[in-house]
Amino acid sequence: CDVARSTVGRAIRELELAGLVHRGDEGFALTVSGHHVVDQFYQFEHAVDAICEVDEWLSTLPDPDLVPPQMFVGGEVTQADIHAPDKAMQETVDLVSTATRVRGVSPAVHGAYVETFQQRIQRDGLETELVFSADALTELATTYAEYVIEDADGVTIYQIDELPPLGLMLVDHQDGTTEASFGIYTENGVQVVVRNTSPNAVAWLREEFESYREQATEIQL
């Protein structure tokens, strides 16, 4: 190691004073607080890596605050690419396929999503609350009219004038877990999806969904 012993010693003393390490019979070891700090560091490092990985798409959003850092801590990132353009979109299909309840916000409508929702609602009575932009609802009512289930139990649809190119979804799974996810849209469809089951991510997305729902108007298809 090229670091001077005096530098190492000074660093250890500072960690001791902070209560992060203690001297034992076999040398220095992390305290309980030290273990927590290390865990937080690795979570932070993972979040930074995830943010940098999707920076190309985050930069397309009109507001940098639309997605908070907690969505990346412990999150799973899936990106579309030239060899698998539907890869990110398939993540959302998979989410809906194992859900017992879905709450979401979407600026767009995709055939794969519509078909999956229709199947789950008809077959399993999937509880669904969705907020669509006005343009997305028009697309749903015209291009995908054959998939629309009128007066379906447990399904509530809302309309809001405009939405950013960001889809949000809060999914309750059959195993009792709740998962938060977001997808970034471009003219070529969904480019990246991030999924996260952490309490902070779920709490943020629940609050965002409720905020959009309060601004929207419930409609009958």
Where are these regions (language model features)?
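Residue-level signal for threonine
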Residues: 31, 110, 133
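Amphipathic alpha-helical interface segments
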Residues: 172-221
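PLD-like (HKD) phosphodiesterase/transphosphatidyltransferase domain
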Residues: 52-130
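Basic, Lys/Arg-rich alpha-helical nucleic-acid-recognition elements, primarily the DNA-binding modules
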Residues: 1-44
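Short acidic/glycine-enriched loop/turn segments that link adjacent beta-strands
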Residues: 111, 162-165, 189
